Amino acid sequence: YFPENSVMVTGYGFDMLYAGPREAILHAIFRQNMGATHLIVGRDHAGVGDYYGAFEAQEIFSQRVPEGALDIEIFSADHTAFSKKLGRVVMMNEVDGHTADDFVLLSGTKVREMLSNGIAPPEEFSRPEVAKVLMDYYQIEGT
C-alpha cells in the first residue's frame, strides 16, 4: 500500500491525556525525541468532545511555539474523506469540483462504534483483514 522506502508508519505507546492543544505540543516533543521528522496534527488532535476548537491544536504551533523551537515538521491536516471521484482519501479542502455527495465521511467515534458492534467500516476506510482484527479487539474491549 505504500511505495518502498518512502513512508514509515509506527505506533507510539503513549496514552492520550485529552489535553487538547498543549498535548499536541507534547506529542511533537516526544516524537521528535524518538527520531520522528514529521507529525500529522489533525482536526481536534487530543481533544475531547467539543471542549476545544476543531483546529486549536494546529493553531497553537504558530501562536505559542517560538520559531525554531522544534525540529519536527508539523503537518496540519484538514477534514479527511474518501473521494468517490478520485478513488482515494483526500483532504477535503485540497480537492476541487466535489460536492458533499462525492465524499464518504466517517468520524473516529463512528468507526469505533461500528467496530464495537461488529460492523466493518467501508473498504474505502479499512482493508477487510484489518477491520476484522479491529472488530475482534473492540468486541473484547466491550466485554
Predicted regions mapped to residue ranges:
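Active-site cores that bind ATP or allylic diphosphates and position pyrophosphate for catalysis
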Residues: 1-143
